[in-house]
A protein has these predicted regions:
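Phosphate-binding and adjacent anionic-ligand microenvironments
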Residues: 1-4, 10, 18-211
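Catalytic core segments in nucleotide and nucleic-acid processing enzymes
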Residues: 15
């Protein structure tokens, strides 16, 4: 069974490398392309994107925050568009060219809980499109004579193996909710300077900092 992170890395690498092979992404324009992920999602996706020169944007947990970034990129692009231009009227190749020319071209988005997106036409996790992306990536791997597991091994041989583990702390009821609020407030008002004997170099507030 593949984890959500493994599928995301498989799709991200295949999608980015395919766009590079097709000449859509080049060394000149890759800096205007981006991969968006939630900050609890594996950093292997970031390593893959950085290898190809793409920007990496981390968001709060939840796919709606990825959708918010896509809306932001649309608004930024249309702020420089001719009067009367409509984003929804643009064809996919026109959107891509515009974003790569003066905006931020969204290549892939994902989170570890099996949610993926390869286009900004949908602003939430898209199971239908994800299934098509996975089928295409599997076909691409098969054309190379390898399995999905083999493809992942190729990724690990380049970027190293990223060990992952999911865990959760459950605080139930009104008392639990109040405790969560107190903890969050304490972290924001007085960020920790050390964890055990390890010094904290910096703290990032994903709810306020520019991502």
């Amino acid at each position: 069974l593949l984890t959500g992170n493994q599928i995301g890395c498989f799709l991200a690498h295949y999608r980015i490398s395919t766009l590079v092979r097709q000449g859509v992404l080049t060394s000149q324009n890759a800096g205007r392309a981006c991969l968006i992920k939630t900050f609890v999602t594996t950093e292997l996706q970031a390593a893959i994107a950085n290898k190809f020169g793409l920007k990496v944007v981390n968001t709060l947990t939840g796919f709606k925050y990825i959708g918010e970034k896509l809306r932001e990129y649309e608004e930024q692009l249309m702020s420089t568009a001719p009067p009367g231009a409509e984003y929804g009227a643009l064809q996919p190749h026109e959107k891509r060219a515009a974003h790569l020319g003066r905006g931020c071209f969204f290549v892939f988005g994902g989170e570890e809980s099996y949610g993926y997106l390869g286009t900004d036409d949908v602003r939430d996790k898209d199971a239908n499109a994800s299934a098509l992306m996975f089928a295409e990536a599997m076909a691409g791997a098969r054309a190379q004579g390898i399995s999905v597991s083999d493809y992942l091994d190729k990724i690990y041989s380049i970027f190293g193996f990223y060990w992952e583990k999911l865990g959760q702390i459950v605080l139930e009821g009104a008392e639990g909710s109040a405790k969560i609020s107190r903890l969050l407030e304490s972290y924001m008002s007085k960020p920790p300077v050390a964890i055990g004997e390890i010094k904290v170099e910096r703290c990032e507030n994903f709810a306020k900092d520019t991502l």
